[in-house]
Amino acid sequence: MKYAVVLVVIGLSLSAVAAEHGPVFGLATPTNSKGEWSFDEGVFGRNTSLGSQASVRELVAYGFTPHLTLSFTLPVVVGNTPLPPTRIQPGDDFDSTVSWRFQHRATKVGTRFESTAFAGLAVPGPQSGFNGIAHTTNVPGTMFGVVTGMASLSNYVWIGSTYTKFYEHNGDKRPDVLDYSLVYGYRPPKWRRPPDKWDWRLFGELVGERSNRFLQANVPVADTQAHQVFIGPTALGIFHNYTVSFGAQFPVYQNVGTTFPKEHVRFAVNFSYLLFQHGH
């Protein structure tokens, strides 16, 4: 599938989008307000010299408190291009994630320092196999992570990481995945608008992910490890309870086993609707 695209909700970072000022690819600290539902879907793609992979994914999130959000994702994959395992990008796993903002400190009007921890369960779906690479198990994996940063009326900075561990079954095991991200955002003063007009932000996002080798019959599968770093621009617009975000990323570092093709570009467009919104 030469130029496939993906309808997706951007996993962990969607909590940030639902909070009205989050990046597309990287991690961020905001959580849903108390009683706030968010519903997301979008378009996402990973293109390589061998083609692209597409997926359809929906995300639903709910804020139990101003600092605690629970989210669920449901994916459908189109295409069978062999790609390195990914967690910071949307894939073909069913996810449930708890986001806990354990630090929230305001220093002046419009400026705050925050830290958020993540814990989740990744359940491989029926399309999660890596055909032609290794026989994989559908045993769920566990995810833990943290992100910290600063947000003001004009500037945003976040740095974070998550680690997803998959478990062995009958000698077979999917690779564990470490991902990390650094995000800077800017909201120009002239772009600050009231809720009845579009309010825009720009982001520069750097993300990386490293996965070890597949395990089959208790033997590591050669040339299935991967470490990639991507960087690129994204944008977020807000209008009433609706948000749209989009962007692209390009590789700046790739150390990928010969089993996989190297990715040329990643791109995304995400849409979000917020229901029963309250202040933090």
Task: Identify the meaning behind each predicted range.
Residues 18-61:
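Short glycine/proline- and aromatic-enriched beta-strand/turn motifs that initiate or cap beta-hairpins
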Residues 19, 62, 66, 74, ...:
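Residue-level signature of outer-membrane beta-barrel architecture
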Residues 23, 35-39, 54-58, 92-98, ...:
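Hydrophobic, lipid-facing positions within transmembrane beta-strands of outer-membrane proteins
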Residues 28-35, 50, 67, 104-114, ...:
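Short loop/turn motifs that connect adjacent beta-strands in outer-membrane beta-barrel proteins
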Residues 41-58, 130-140, 221-224:
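Surface-exposed strand-loop-strand hairpins of Gram-negative outer-membrane beta-barrel proteins
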Residues 41-45, 72-76, 117-123, 159-165, ...:
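Transmembrane beta-barrel strands of outer-membrane/channel proteins
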Residues 78-175, 222, 262, 271-280:
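Outer-membrane pore/translocation modules
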Residues 182-280:
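Outer membrane beta-barrel transmembrane domains
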